[in-house]
Amino acid sequence: SLTYFLTKPYSYPNHVWVDVTMHNLSLPPLAIKNPECLGLLHQLDRNKDVWMQHYCILKDGCLYFYSSIRSTSALGGIYLQGYTVTEQSLNSRRCIIELRPPSEEFKAFYLSAGNAAENKRWITALKMSINKWLPLHQAIQDFMSRPLEETRM
C-alpha cells in the first residue's frame, strides 16, 4: 500500500493551517468540511509502473489520499504550495495531471481522473487551491522580513 507523509512545510513552520491539515489526516473523507474538490483519482506508482486508485479530497492547498470513501483516516497527503499543475499526454488513451514540485528534493506526482472533463475539473481546482495560498505566503514573508519594532502589537 502507498503511504504519503505530510511534513510541516518549511515556509509555514508554526502556522495554524499546518495544525488543521495534520488534524484532517485523522478524519474520514466526508468529515472534511467544504472541500474544494473530491472524487476518485488514479496515482501512478512509478516504482511498480501501476496506477493506484484513491478517493481524494482537496482542501486548503492540501490533497488528501484515502483508500476509499469509507476510510476512517487518510493514507496521507501532499502539501501543494509551490507545486505547478499541468496536463500531460501519457499516450493516446490517457491524459494525466502532473504535479511538479518547487525543487528537485521533492517528488513529482502523476494523477489521472476518469476522463478528460474530470481531469480538467481537478486541474482547475488544484490551481485555484494553490493560488489561494500564494497571497498568504507572500504576506507571511513580508511580515517576517520587517524590522522587529514594526511587528510588535
Predicted regions and their residues:
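Short amphipathic alpha-helical segments embedded in low-complexity Lys/Glu-rich regions
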Residues: 15, 20-23, 59, 73, ...
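Phosphoinositide-dependent membrane-docking surfaces
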Residues: 63, 79-89
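Polybasic, Ser/Thr-rich intrinsically disordered tails and inter-domain linkers
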Residues: 1, 5-33, 37-38, 42-47, ...
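Canonical pleckstrin homology
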Residues: 48-53, 85-142
